[in-house]
A protein has these predicted regions:
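Eukaryotic intrinsically disordered, low-complexity regulatory linkers and tails enriched in Ser/Thr/Pro
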Residues: 1-162
Length: 162
């Protein structure tokens, strides 16, 4: 382990990484992709995008799956609120081929799983939804999130939550 990592608690950033880390954000690992690197930090997963990098908070990753060659990440968008709950909609999964993945797939999966305190599927008018209590990196407490199941509209969830 390098002296820098021992002193700061931060892993080293890969060459060419242009994201801006928070002062308390720790680098845990990284792996090269065809478009740059995936960088795993205490606050989320940094992914390459046109012109740089962006961080996906652990609380906004609905699913992370490793198929032996690539990491598939399903990111959620915040689509509003209903009472105290944050409504989520999933984006199509993004695929990140990792020729030398190291521990990245396990770290990502573990971080996503540990962000979930509890979850349960509930019936709502016109369908069902997944209710999730999640820890948000860098914040105290938990956030209640609701992800409608396919075919269940956001309005049905809003109505159910009053």
């Amino acid at each position: 382990m390098s002296l820098w990592r021992r002193l700061t608690g931060r892993g080293e950033l890969p060459d060419g990484f242009t994201g801006r880390l928070e002062g308390f954000e720790r680098v845990l690992a990284s792996a090269a992709t065809s478009d740059g690197h995936l960088v795993i930090t205490s606050l989320g997963l940094w992914v390459p995008v046109a012109g740089g990098y962006r961080r996906i908070g652990w609380h906004l990753i609905s699913n992370a799956r490793w198929d032996g060659r690539a990491l598939h990440v399903t990111e959620a968008d915040e689509a509003g609120t209903a009472g105290e709950a944050v409504l989520l909609t999933d984006r199509p999964a993004s695929r990140y081929p990792l020729p030398a993945p190291g521990h990245v797939p396990q770290l990502v999966h573990g971080r996503v799983v540990r962000s979930v305190e509890a979850s349960e599927r509930r019936e709502v008018p016109g369908g069902s939804a997944l209710f999730i209590r999640r820890r948000v990196p860098g914040r105290d407490g938990v956030q209640v999130q609701v992800r409608p199941d396919p075919g269940t509209g956001l309005d049905a969830v809003r109505q159910a939550l009053g």
